[in-house]
């Protein structure tokens, strides 16, 4: 992985997050977990490059995010192999499966000790800045509540500073 300036990124975020998806990973070489996310944002806030990540509290990765200052967002591309990894990491819990063993992902330690993956075409290392909890009362467009009916609880929202970016 080659470290790059985050301001050099020129990905179309609608394609990158909305269609390609990403792995959200928290922890360190001794204890980490990753999950697939297809909701998120990249932008500029508080004079910092930021990402916004949405994680349900019941997810195994959520607890590890809570215990750590940093997380990574890893983008594997749109290949058939990447899609298999995304599908597995999005449907199986790290409580029950060794996702590295099951997917063949190769963990790589970042400068801050976070975990990225050798297969990633792009990894954003991020530091938590802000967290909020989504609740039904906060929705201005109540039609959006349809996303939550039978699907489980509301997401927590993390605003994270992009501290490092790595490209393959």
Regions found by a protein language model. Give the residues of each.
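Active-site-proximal mixed secondary-structure blocks
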Residues: 1-37, 41-168
């Amino acid at each position: 992985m080659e470290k790059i300036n985050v301001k050099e990124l020129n990905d179309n975020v609608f394609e990158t997050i909305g269609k390609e998806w990403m792995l959200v990973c928290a922890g360190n070489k001794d204890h980490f977990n990753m999950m697939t996310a297809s909701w998120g944002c990249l932008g500029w806030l508080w004079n910092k490059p930021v990402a916004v990540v949405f994680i349900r509290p019941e997810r195994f990765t959520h607890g590890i995010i809570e215990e750590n200052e940093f997380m990574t967002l890893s983008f594997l591309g749109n290949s058939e192999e990447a899609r298999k990894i995304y599908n597995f990491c999005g449907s199986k819990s790290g409580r029950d499966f060794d996702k590295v063993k099951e997917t063949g992902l190769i963990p790589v330690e970042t400068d801050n000790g976070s975990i990225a993956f050798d297969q990633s075409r792009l990894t954003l290392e991020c530091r938590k800045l802000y967290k909020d909890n989504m609740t039904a009362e906060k929705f201005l467009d109540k039609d959006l509540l349809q996303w939550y009916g039978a699907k489980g609880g509301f997401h927590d929202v993390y605003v994270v500073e992009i501290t490092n970016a790595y490209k393959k």
